Amino acid sequence: MQVTEGQLVALQDARFALVAARFNDLIVDRLIDGAADTLRRHGVPEEHLELIRVPGSFELPLAVQRVADAGRADAVIALGAVIRGGTDHHQYVAAECTKGVAQAMMGSGVPVSYGVLTVETVEQAIERAGTKAGNKGAEAALSALEMVDLMRQLEA
């Protein structure tokens, strides 16, 4: 059986867009740093990285869709943090963000890595943004690198 899978390689011409929420910026900024650092460490030139900020995670899908449709990137990395509050609001934001980002990926054919934290507490968010549980932004960047390579293999 022939196996095709993406590798963690940076193709010198690959472009990456990080679309990140400003809400919960103390957390999201760490996710951005983790994603950008990972891409740089894998050889992606600075001029091939673009950061696009949106007000909150609910707005991520539209910006992701526009970036993907415009052909501005070979992969998009969605970054945000949805933290439970005193109401059910976070559930609706998280669900619509997840669904919208997935629809943007499927509709555009451009890989979108999901680095949006959906957590119960600020402490959990901090853990997933670079302390005990690693950096989910960095993990999303690794997924994006692999998917760009895989998409190019599948097109060949």
From Swiss-Prot:
Give the record's GO biological process terms: riboflavin biosynthetic process
Pathway(s) per entry? Cofactor biosynthesis; riboflavin biosynthesis; riboflavin from 2-hydroxy-3-oxobutyl phosphate and 5-amino-6-(D-ribitylamino)uracil: step 1/2
Gene Ontology terms, MF aspect? 6,7-dimethyl-8-ribityllumazine synthase activity
Residues annotated as binding (2S)-2-hydroxy-3-oxobutyl phosphate are G86, T87, R128
Active site (UniProt): H89 (proton donor)
Question: What reaction is this protein's catalytic activity?
Answer: (2S)-2-hydroxy-3-oxobutyl phosphate + 5-amino-6-(D-ribitylamino)uracil = 6,7-dimethyl-8-(1-D-ribityl)lumazine + phosphate + 2 H2O + H(+)
Is Membrane a UniProt keyword of this protein?
no
The record ties this protein, via Gene3D superfamilies, to: Lumazine/riboflavin synthase (3.40.50.960)
The EC number(s) attached to this protein equal 2.5.1.78
Q: Which Pfam families match?
A: DMRL_synthase (PF00885)
Q: Which UniProt keywords apply?
A: Riboflavin biosynthesis, Transferase
Q: Which CDD domains match?
A: Lumazine_synthase-I
Q: Which domain of life is it from?
A: Bacteria
Q: Name one GO cellular component term.
A: riboflavin synthase complex
Which InterPro entries does this chain map to? LS, LS/RS, LS/RS_sf
- Decide whether keyword Calcium is in the record: no
Per the entry, what this protein does is:
Catalyzes the formation of 6,7-dimethyl-8-ribityllumazine by condensation of 5-amino-6-(D-ribitylamino)uracil with 3,4-dihydroxy-2-butanone 4-phosphate. This is the penultimate step in the biosynthesis of riboflavin.
Q: How does it assemble?
A: Forms an icosahedral capsid composed of 60 subunits, arranged as a dodecamer of pentamers.
**Entry similarity comment:** Belongs to the DMRL synthase family.
User: In its UniProt entry, what is this protein called?
Assistant: 6,7-dimethyl-8-ribityllumazine synthase
Q: Which organism is it from?
A: Halorhodospira halophila (strain DSM 244 / SL1) (Ectothiorhodospira halophila (strain DSM 244 / SL1))
What lineage is this protein's organism placed in? Bacteria, Pseudomonadati, Pseudomonadota, Gammaproteobacteria, Chromatiales
